[in-house]
Amino acid sequence: MKSKVIVDELTMKRAITRITYEIIERNKQLDNVVLVGIKTRGVYLARRIQERLEQLESLHLAVGELDTKPFRDDMRVEEDTTSMPVDITGKDIILVDDVLYTGRTIRAAIDNLVSLGRPGRVSLAVLVDRGHRELPIRADYVGKNIPTSKTEEIVVEVVEVDGQDRISIVDPE
């Protein structure tokens, strides 16, 4: 199994900053936006975007935590650990995740989201888009496009969980 670091801490920070600037540019009513991180690493990325928005715009946005496991079609989990600090009805939701691959996690996230309320709009921010979609889902905000083969895996590490910030590509062969 070969692993290669392809994005270091500084480059990862820049990608998050770029996503933040794009969110500012594309959202006329930032005070109506709710950032919703997809557990686990998406939550930490959403918090980092929130921190950058606070620094740049002096605006504190709510950050929710979305558990997709109970809504996935490939596993059965009863407990839903979703935490949403505000009513999402009519809000502009930005789902935040670390890697966009087949689109199945995002489908599950949207299913969970609409079970909580009726958002005005839903968009998607991902740190890495690696391609290979199985569903018609695309990200509105992308930190890095990293084409991969289907056998390769993208591993995103965040300091809050893994002790460091970096992105690696792993080839099991």
UniProtKB/Swiss-Prot annotation:
GO terms for biological process: DNA-templated transcription termination. Keywords: Glycosyltransferase, RNA-binding, Transcription, Transcription regulation, Transcription termination, Transferase. It catalyses: UMP + diphosphate = 5-phospho-alpha-D-ribose 1-diphosphate + uracil. A motif (PRPP-binding) lies at residues 93-105. The keyword Aminoacyl-tRNA synthetase does not apply. GO terms for molecular function: RNA binding; uracil phosphoribosyltransferase activity. Pfam families: Pribosyltran (PF00156). It is an enzyme of class 2 (transferase). Its EC number is 2.4.2.9. Homodimer and homohexamer; in equilibrium. PANTHER family: BIFUNCTIONAL PROTEIN PYRR (PTHR11608:SF0). NCBIfam families: PRK05205.1-4, PRK05205.1-5. Regulates transcriptional attenuation of the pyrimidine nucleotide (pyr) operon by binding in a uridine-dependent manner to specific sites on pyr mRNA. This disrupts an antiterminator hairpin in the RNA and favors formation of a downstream transcription terminator, leading to a reduced expression of downstream genes. Belongs to the purine/pyrimidine phosphoribosyltransferase family. PyrR subfamily. This is Bifunctional protein PyrR. It comes from Streptococcus equi subsp. zooepidemicus (strain MGCS10565). The lineage of its organism: Bacteria, Bacillati, Bacillota, Bacilli, Lactobacillales.
